[in-house]
Amino acid sequence: MVTDDRPAEELDVWFITDMVLCNFECPYCCAYKVITTKKVWHEQDSYDRFLRITERLTQVPYKLRMRMQTLGEPLVSKEFLERTGWLVSHDNISFIELVTNASLLSKRLKIITDNGGDLTKISLWATYHHTEIKMDKFLDEVQFAHDAGAFVVVNSLAFPDTIDTVEELYKKCAERGLRMNVDPGYKDGGGEYDEEGGALVPILEVPGGKERLYAMTANQNVLEANLRAADTVDGEECSAGGDYFIVLADGRVGPCCPLLSQGMQLGNMLDENYTLAPGKKKYSVCTVDRRTPILGHLPLVGDHFRRRWPCKNKEDFGHLKVIRENEVRSPSLGWFGG
């Protein structure tokens, strides 16, 4: 069933690279199998593939709204930042969003501008890691990037043992006029979603936890869609494969993370005969099998993160029609706060 035949003017792209160097050692890192302080790229040909894929992205005949994700920390790699500056300078790139721990923004953001990048086309998803950096230091780095012209969102996950810290961070962001996104932290190993979400989202098991989480959410509609999508997306309409695509480090292209996990590959960015283009329709009913591990396509992620949840990534469920039809578009694949 397809319900919308409007042509896409822009494409949303979630490009996951295998850059693995990081300056943090978070004990809960989902990429713990490969994260390292010793090398920049996971494989010998990773950087070459990265260059070729980004070259192909500049040739796509559509505007691209892109989250370019690393498994490590993007700010530690000079060559990654140089390429980011080069890539975002192209006319068909609406913005590039980087997922960062923010610790090096004041020292390294200049590399992007030195290589042709306009910071007003740079978006930063700055996640606070409370075990690795002091809150005020983190906020000073975020403030620097915000004042320099980048679109910045502070991000944090609410767990029972972090909720007090998250609330403190939320208050300080409000005082500074910074955007903040608070997502529910998921339980390791998965589990079925029940009526109250308690089997999936630990913060909802805590007395008053639901109220505290909802008080900080930037968009209640998105939060509720998040919890639904983690359980089932049966019957939900989505723009995955219409105007949203995932690109992996080896060039594979899929409609979204869950569908690519099921083997629905649309092409490969390393194939010169393939062109990334919108689907015939914007929306179609989701066909994700809830029994498929949604990260099964990504062997770099730890085994205990291979959860059998249909749709848990915000990049993916953010393209459900129930969200897309009500959202204010921003230069981010994760921010829906207006």
Report residues per predicted region.
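Short, cysteine/histidine-rich loop/knuckle motifs that typically chelate Zn2+
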Residues: 28-29, 240, 285
